[in-house]
């Protein structure tokens, strides 16, 4: 949602615009 996809590998959200992964 809002240009964000849920990464099932990390369970975090990845921004398609900047390809950023959350490290929480």
Curated annotation (Swiss-Prot):
Signal peptide: none annotated. One of its GO terms (cellular component) is extracellular region. It comes from the Eukaryota. Expressed by the venom gland. Residues 1-24 form the LCN-type CS-alpha/beta domain. Keywords: Ion channel impairing toxin, Neurotoxin, Secreted, Toxin, Voltage-gated sodium channel impairing toxin. It is found in: Secreted. The keyword Methyltransferase does not apply. InterPro entries: LCN-type_CS_alpha_beta_dom. GO terms for molecular function: ion channel inhibitor activity; sodium channel regulator activity; toxin activity. Belongs to the long (4 C-C) scorpion toxin superfamily. Sodium channel inhibitor family. Alpha subfamily. Has the structural arrangement of an alpha-helix connected to antiparallel beta-sheets by disulfide bonds (CS-alpha/beta). Binds to sodium channels (Nav) and inhibits the inactivation of the activated channels, thereby blocking neuronal transmission. This toxin is active against mammals. This is Neurotoxin-2. It comes from Hottentotta tamulus (Eastern Indian scorpion).
């Amino acid at each position: 949602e809002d240009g964000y996809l849920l990464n099932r590998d990390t369970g975090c959200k990845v921004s398609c615009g900047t390809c950023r992964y959350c490290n929480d």
